[in-house]
A protein has these predicted regions:
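Modules that initiate DNA replication and primer synthesis
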Residues: 2-70
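Extended intrinsically disordered or low-complexity regions, especially N/C-terminal cytosolic tails and loops
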Residues: 3, 46-48, 52, 56-298, ...
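Acidic/aromatic/glycine-rich contiguous surface patches that form carbohydrate-binding/processing clefts
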Residues: 306
Length: 421
């Protein structure tokens, strides 16, 4: 049999059969090599077992990759993304004018959405065109489409189910309202966590200057240079001069007390100082709070930079690379939200985990009733805005699973914010 015949026959094998055939050949080669090298029998067995686990993992990874590719092909069946624009020049690679995806006019953007099953019944095409040209760009608006389910069969396979352009506009507006509410909450968490550190310094009779010197001394050479360099730049008269805090920093730069440092530190460096204080005072609760504050800082940055949030509230959203903080999970247990599959699924979503950190921090750091009441009112208005469109979005058990993520967030608001009022 020729080599081409053998290759042709191998293509008729199933993925599993081909995997077994390949593994058997590799085992023989691997075993003979180990024998030639004088490996003992037990070492040979251990090596072959290790190889078996490796190839099994490789096979499973390949199967998962192929399944994902098949899913992507299914979802993109009705999408014109892979089709070249007939009005533009394209080469044999499918690229258009040197780019994989050309810029679309507003008219083409609407046509693209229609080809994916998006309807224009609640908002007509002319109004949609004005929205895309004046209110919000196409990239951000269409990003919310991932929250809706697609047809999995029939003539309209791959198209979105019951998705109108008005739904994208509504979610874009709700997302903007979320960012505004979250950002204000983040600002208060930063402020009151700094107030807590200052109060703890006073309670522990810390020398306000000595603690800052100790903090700087325990930093690495690069960390210290980076921190001092940033402060000097803000205090200088150059381009990076801070017109709000620069004069204060300049006045105390060479001998800075803790109350000035807390005013000068941005949120990120402050979390490092918070951890330093936790270690200095051997306070395990503060150590855990430090990790929560880092999550709040990440959410604050996203809100301040106007990043979309709601479009990631799905099971496909980016996963948190860490287990939920004990302070948060213990509080959830105390409030009756136990360690269920639903809770684990929601908190595995990085955005939900950061939102949970913010809401817990509001309860933990913002102890003034007037502060909590102010935030409770804002969250109530945000919830009303979402609930006003609930009929369009469906219920938790419907295909649009993002609704259950919002429901989980409302539960967190109830236990950590609303119940405090």
């Amino acid at each position: 049999m020729s080599q081409n015949d053998r290759l042709a026959n191998s293509e008729t094998l199933s993925g599993k059969d081909l995997y077994i055939h390949t593994e058997a050949v590799l085992f023989l080669v691997w075993g003979k090599l180990l024998i030639l090298l004088g490996i003992s029998s037990q070492e040979l067995i251990d090596a072959l077992c290790s190889s078996a686990f490796h190839w099994n993992d490789l096979y499973r990874s390949q199967q998962m990759y192929r399944a994902k590719e098949q899913e992507n092909r299914l979802c993109n069946t009705a999408s014109p993304d892979n089709q070249p624009d007939k009005s533009s020049s394209s080469d044999e690679t499918g690229q258009i004018n040197g780019h994989m995806k050309p810029a679309l006019t507003v008219t083409q953007q609407i046509s693209h959405l229609k080809s994916q099953g998006v309807t224009f019944k609640l908002i007509d095409e002319s109004e949609a065109a004005r929205y895309l040209a004046e209110a919000n760009n196409y990239l951000r608006t269409r990003s919310y489409r991932v929250l809706f389910s697609r047809q999995t069969g029939g003539a309209h396979i791959g198209e979105y189910v019951n998705l109108d352009f008005a739904d994208l506009v509504t979610l874009s507006r709700i997302d903007r309202e979320m960012r505004e509410v979250f950002l204000l909450a983040c600002i208060d968490v930063e402020h009151f966590s700094k107030m807590r550190v200052l109060r703890l310094c006073e309670e522990r009779h810390e020398d306000g200057y000595a603690i800052v010197s100790s903090f700087a001394a325990q930093l690495s050479h690069n960390e210290r240079n980076h921190l001092l360099g940033a402060l000097r730049a803000r205090a200088s008269e150059g381009k990076r001069h801070d017109i709000y805090s620069g004069d204060l920093i300049a006045h105390y730069l060479d001998d800075m007390p803790v109350w000035v440092l807390l005013e000068a530190l941005e949120f990120g460096p402050f979390t490092n100082f918070y951890l330093f204080c936790a270690d200095r005072w051997n306070d395990e609760t503060m150590r855990q709070e430090h990790y929560v504050l880092k999550s709040v800082k990440a959410l604050r940055n996203a809100c301040a930079h106007d990043s979309c949030i709601a479009n990631g509230l799905t099971t496909a959203g980016e996963r948190a690379g860490y287990a939920p903080n004990l302070l948060i999970t213990n509080s959830l247990n105390d409030h009756g939200i136990h360690n269920s599959r639903s809770r684990r699924t929601k908190l595995r979503n990085l955005r939900v985990a950061q939102i949970a950190a913010l809401l817990w921090s509001l309860s933990a750091f913002c102890t003034r009733d007037s502060t909590i009441e102010r935030h409770a009112i804002r969250f109530a208005r945000l919830r009303e805005s979402f609930e006003a469109n609930r009929e369009r979005f469906g219920n938790d058990d419907d295909a649009n699973a993002f609704v259950s993520y919002f429901e989980f967030i409302w539960k967190l608001v109830d236990i950590w914010v609303s119940q405090r009022v």
